Design a protein with these regions (language model features):
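Catalytic glutamate of the conserved HExxH
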Residues: 63, 67-71
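Short, Lys/Arg-rich amphipathic alpha-helical interaction segments
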Residues: 100-107
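Active-site scaffold of zinc-dependent metalloenzymes
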Residues: 2-58, 71-75, 79-94
Length: 107
């Protein structure tokens, strides 16, 4: 996976994917790894931890999948599922596991 800024579509909606060093959080005790802004159609993925160390690729990939799943639920109007963080995280981890087994690959 090439972790660089790009755009992609979920059906007819274009999202901008941005990889950033830091994502500001209202809670200083937590670290936000990713965000999905449904009004601006922007997904941000944090690439460095609080100490400035690069986050490993596996965690970046799961975070990317997690945020894409949020966008999928939002675009499909599955707003209750979108708010279910354990469901979103579980789905992301399951997809990553299937991708690692090369069950889900591009053409």
């Amino acid at each position: 996976m090439n972790f660089k800024n790009r755009t992609f579509k979920i059906f007819n909606t274009t999202y901008k994917l941005k990889f950033v060093d830091n994502i500001e959080s209202e809670d200083n005790n937590s670290t936000v790894l990713g965000t999905t802004d449904s009004s601006l159609k922007i997904i941000e993925i944090r690439t460095k931890d609080k100490l400035g160390k690069v986050i490993n690729k596996n965690d970046l990939y799961i975070t990317l999948l997690h945020e894409i799943i949020h966008a999928i639920f939002i675009e499909g109007q599955y707003l209750q599922a979108n708010q279910d963080e354990p469901l979103v995280e579980w789905t992301a981890k399951c997809l990553k596991h299937l991708i690692d087994q090369k069950l889900l690959v591009g053409n």
